[in-house]
Amino acid sequence: MNIAWGWVNPLAGLRGIGLTLLAMSIFCPLTAMSQVPPRFYWKSLSGGNAVPLIVTSMTGNTNPFDASHLVTPGAEFEGTLALAGYAHTFSLFERSAMAAVLIPMGRLSGDVTTPEGRAASQSVSGFGDPTVEFNINLIGPKAQKTIPDALRYEPGFSLDVLADLAIPIGEYDSSQPLNVGQNRWYGRIGFPIVWQLGAWVPGRRTTLEFLPAVWLFGDNTDFVGETMETDPLYQIDAHLTRDFTEHLWGSLDAAWYNGAK
C-alpha cells in the first residue's frame, strides 16, 4: 500500500496544458513500473494535455524497471526511478479517449547471480523502455466537447478499455543481467474503473478506482547468452481518493500481482 497526494489545477478541464504533479510518492517495488497514478483516468475536456510525473526510491529483490516483477532470490536491488510522460485527450465516436506516452528513467544497482551461477555487483543508469497507451471510455459520461460539458462532468460509474505497448529501445547490455531496458516487446490490456462516491463537489470529491489488467511478454532472446520467456502477469490496482480542499487531494493505493513465471 502507498500514499500519494496531488494538486488540482484550477483550470483543469479547459483547453491548454494542465499539469499534474505526483511527487514524493512512495511505491512498493512491485508496483513502481506498472501502477498508474490515482485519478489518471478522470475525464476532461477533449483537446486537453497533461504531464504526469512520479519519482520513487526503493530497495528489494526485483528490478523495478522490469514490468514482469520477476523476483530474484538472494538479490538486493537499490534504485531511483522517475516516470515522466505526456497525455492528450480527444473525442472518438462520442466517447472520451486518451493517448499517452510514459518514459522511465533512473539508476539501479544491486548484487545479482547470472544464469551460470556467477555472483556480480552491477550499477546501471539511463532511460528504460518507453510505453505508449491508448484508452477509450465504454461506460460513463459522453466526451466533453465544450466548457459547459466539463463543468457538468461527474464520473458516476465509468468503465474504460486500455492498451499499452512498451517499445524495447531502453538502455540494455546483453552481457549483464541487470538493465533498465528489457530488450523485448511487452504490453498490457486493462479495464480502468472510476466509481464516484457521494456528491461531486470540489473539496469533497471521493472516488474508488480499480485497474484489472493482464500483461503479455515477448521473449528476450539475448539475456546473458540465454533466452528469457515470461508467462502472462495478472494485475489489480486500487485507489481510494479524497479531496482535502478544492486544490489538494490524497489517495490510499494498493496492488495485487500474480503470474510472470
Describe the residue ranges of each PLM region.
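Outer-membrane beta-barrel biogenesis signature
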Residues: 30-54, 58-62, 142-155
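Bacterial N-terminal signal peptides
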Residues: 17-29
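Surface-exposed strand-loop-strand hairpins of Gram-negative outer-membrane beta-barrel proteins
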Residues: 58-81, 118-120, 174-179
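Outer-membrane pore/translocation modules
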Residues: 106-230
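Outer-membrane beta-barrel channels and translocator barrels
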Residues: 46, 58, 91-94, 106, ...
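Residue-level detector of the transmembrane beta-barrel scaffold of outer-membrane proteins
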Residues: 50-54, 98-100, 133, 160-162, ...
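Residues on the lipid-exposed face of transmembrane beta-strands in outer-membrane beta-barrel proteins
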Residues: 53, 84-88, 132-138, 163, ...
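Outer membrane beta-barrel transmembrane domains
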Residues: 64, 72, 220-261
